[in-house]
């Protein structure tokens, strides 16, 4: 999962716009709409500049709630460290700790948490669930993983590539199933002007609608299924 610097910058970017109308949510990587490269550059700076990291506290006095329907090690640690590094207070809510899906609906949960939290992250099964939470939440919502999208992971992958080579301009290849990470990598590569080639087994191709979105975003780039 992502190193904490990229999650720090995701949190800062989304929560800095919490007072805007409409509020900004991160449900898929293309929600950043042209700001992804700047976010990656700032995350690398925060990782390498201790002085900057120590003084950059935009979440001072804020509380961030993180709901986990799925077990997590790296995602949970990264979000908790990221919120703390930005001066905020992380609150982790495991599936068995709250009434979500039992006596309370997603809409009810969103309304309650919005009264106490400045932002919400949600690691869930169905992507429609995080969409529903964002719809009814009055504070920003970040998708910490759904069956369709994993935006923070894709951003972290591209951050790592940026650290290892001078420029991510060129080609990225993916071998494996067409899962949530591939979906956001395709959208991110389209946003950044990177050609991506992917090889997936028959029956495990990426979602056709997301492929179409990526192609529409980057008509002059190569998105090749091998």
Which positions does each model-derived feature cover?
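One-carbon transfer enzymes
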Residues: 1-16
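Active-site cofactor/substrate anionic-group-binding motifs, chiefly glycine-
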Residues: 63, 68-115
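Glycine-rich phosphate/diphosphate-binding loop of Rossmann-like nucleotide-binding domains
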Residues: 69-81, 165-222
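Short, structured coil segments at secondary-structure junctions
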Residues: 86, 116, 136-137, 192
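Anion-binding alpha/beta catalytic cores of soluble intermediary-metabolism enzymes, centered on
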Residues: 110-111, 118-188
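Conserved small/polar residues in nucleotide/adenosyl-binding loops
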Residues: 224-226
